[in-house]
Regions:
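N-proximal low-complexity "stem/linker" segments adjacent to membrane-targeting elements
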Residues: 1-27
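A conserved acidic beta->alpha catalytic loop
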Residues: 41-49, 93
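Acidic helix N-cap motif at the loop->helix transition within catalytic regions
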Residues: 17-20, 46-53
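Conserved donor NDP-sugar-binding/catalytic core segment of glycosyltransferases
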Residues: 93, 98-105
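Catalytic metal- and UDP-sugar-binding loop of GT-A-like glycosyltransferases, i.e.
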Residues: 62, 88-90
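Glycine-rich, basic loop-to-helix element that forms the pyrophosphate-binding segment
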Residues: 62-80
Length: 105
């Protein structure tokens, strides 16, 4: 397995269909970096988990009462194996397909 350069952490809860577009854009990044996507879900009741499972994400589920903006991000970062950690929200569409490359450079 290749060394992971970047861990992208996305906290989720009831993200809805926009998450599908976000994940598609993340996985279409043009970059020299090897990256993983970590989704930390805190009790979604909609289609969020099904959407995440369509992609090669690492999914971690936590109880809703364990959610905290910083705490959840820290948990996701701790699961990552990348040299760099990047956080995005469940509704943040990357601005371009070179977003990750530009961000890390």
């Amino acid at each position: 397995m290749s060394k992971i350069d970047v861990s992208i952490v996305i906290p989720t809860k009831n993200a809805g269909p926009l998450l599908d577009r976000v994940l598609q854009a993340v996985f279409e990044q043009k970059t020299e970096y090897v990256y993983e996507v970590i989704c930390v879900d805190s009790g979604s009741k909609d289609e969020t988990l099904d959407i995440i499972r369509k992609y090669p994400c690492r999914l971690f589920q936590i109880p809703p009462e364990e959610f905290g903006h910083g705490k959840t991000r820290n948990y996701g970062a701790a699961q990552g194996t990348g040299t760099f950690i990047v956080f995005i929200t469940q509704d943040a569409l990357p601005a371009a397909d070179t977003w990750l490359q530009n961000f890390i450079d």
